[in-house]
Regions:
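Canonical P-loop GTPase G-domain recognition
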Residues: 153-219
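Conserved C-terminal guanine-recognition region of P-loop GTPase G domains, centered on the G4
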Residues: 79-176
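Non-catalytic alpha-helical coupling and interface elements of nucleotide-dependent molecular machines
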Residues: 15, 63, 67, 142-145, ...
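Short, conserved acidic/polar surface loops in the N-terminal third of protein domains
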Residues: 68-72, 132, 160, 188-190
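Amphipathic alpha-helical transducer elements in NTP-driven molecular machines
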Residues: 40-43, 103-106, 189
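Non-catalytic alpha-helical scaffolds
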Residues: 1-17, 118, 142, 198-220
Length: 220
């Protein structure tokens, strides 16, 4: 029996992280969905199984609230002459008092991403590409885990998909997936899992089984 793939669902507040999880788990009662910022205040998890075998664990995380200040704080954590890599800086953050105070919500996100195989970075594609989102990606990249951007709300006439694609490419994130959690495409789960399999080749067997199970249920 293989170990389940562990994914952290991360991103800014109100981008549709919980709605995406409701779609993937087919559980309308998962989490709390609201237009209020920071609706999710703690990490919530769900497990997807096929024939009694757990294949995927998904963790909904709080929205990142102040990545700009957090990135400045991470830079200040390095002592003179030090060259810490991303995970080392994150470990120092989690050991700090700020991780239990000012950056408590961000620390929850970092802690879960470090404990995961990869992260789904959910983006409200209607939003302009702002500096705070670039800083969020810089913080998340410091965890050293593969990130798959998920462009949400792409069915909206106000989407800025091309702007986001260009911005993500400049950050080295060329693999992404379109997945509107309000009006999910019929093949949305397949495309999401196939994109993940490109980033996590060792998890392909679990992801292929999830795809096959979803298509069997859809055809029933």
């Amino acid at each position: 029996m293989t170990e389940p793939l562990i994914l952290a669902v991360v991103g800014h507040t109100n981008t549709g992280k919980t709605s995406l999880l409701r779609t993937l788990t087919r559980d309308r009662g998962f989490g709390e969905v609201s237009h209020r910022p920071s609706t999710t205040r703690h990490v919530e998890g769900a497990r997807l199984s096929v024939d009694g075998e757990a294949l995927l664990e998904l963790y909904d995380t709080p929205g990142l609230e102040d990545a700009i200040a957090l990135l400045d704080y991470l830079d200040a954590l390095e002592r003179p002459g030090e060259r810490l890599d991303g995970p080392e800086r994150m470990a120092r953050l989690l050991d700090s008092n700020e991780a239990r105070g000012r950056f408590e919500q961000e620390a929850k996100v970092v802690r879960q991403l470090l404990a995961s195989d990869a992260g789904l970075y959910v983006i409200d594609a209607r939003e302009p590409v702002l500096a705070k989102y670039r800083d969020e990606l810089a913080v998340l990249a410091g965890c050293g885990r593969p990130l798959l951007p998920v462009l949400n709300f792409v069915a909206s006439p106000q989407h800025r998909e091309e702007e986001w694609r260009a911005a993500l490419a400049r950050l080295g994130l060329h693999a992404l997936v379109r997945f509107d959690s309000v009006a999910p495409p019929l093949d949305g789960e397949r495309r999401l899992y196939e994109s993940l399999a490109l980033l996590l080749e060792r998890a392909r067997p679990q992801l292929d089984r999830l795809i096959a199970d979803h298509e069997t249920q859809a055809a029933a």
